[in-house]
Amino acid sequence: EFKPEISAILNLTPDHMDRHKTMECYGAAKANVFRNQDPDQYCVMNYDDKTCFALAENCRAKVVPFSRKEELDFGAFVKDGRIVIKDENGDVTDICGADELQIPGMHNLENALAACAMAYFGGIDHEVIAETLRSFRGVEHRIELCNEIDGIRFVNDSKGTNPDAAIK
């Protein structure tokens, strides 16, 4: 029985529709990640993606929202250009500047917020989280700069699997 201490759902956009057929089926499949979690465990969810965040209604784990757009009462978010975590007691921990991330794109800021929340609520020291975010340069085939010629950037994003990924 799969039962993670910390789970996450980053978004819910049309992808893998050949397998799932409908968005409802796809959402249900993603929600399986937290199906067996207990109230003392965590599920990190994208507050800005309302379709995704609606899945939280059926989650027994503590839902930890993240947002790149709004300051939250609890969770990971950007405040004054800084990635911060606000815990259950309302204490705010500054992690690092959003501009210190080495990977481009708003979706990567969202990924960083989710990773930050998972690490923080998993007990990782905030300085370790900050250094990891500052030093992570991405993965092969994902917005990978191959060359720049006469001001034109050539980017390998062959791991992108849907239009939403290409747009972001």
Regions inferred by a protein language model and the residue ranges of each:
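Short, intrinsically disordered, charge-balanced linker/junction segments flanking boundaries
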Residues: 1, 7, 165-168
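Acidic, Mg2+-coordinating active-site environments of NTP-dependent enzymes
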Residues: 3-153
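Glycine-rich phosphate/pyrophosphate-binding beta-alpha loops
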Residues: 138-141, 156-167
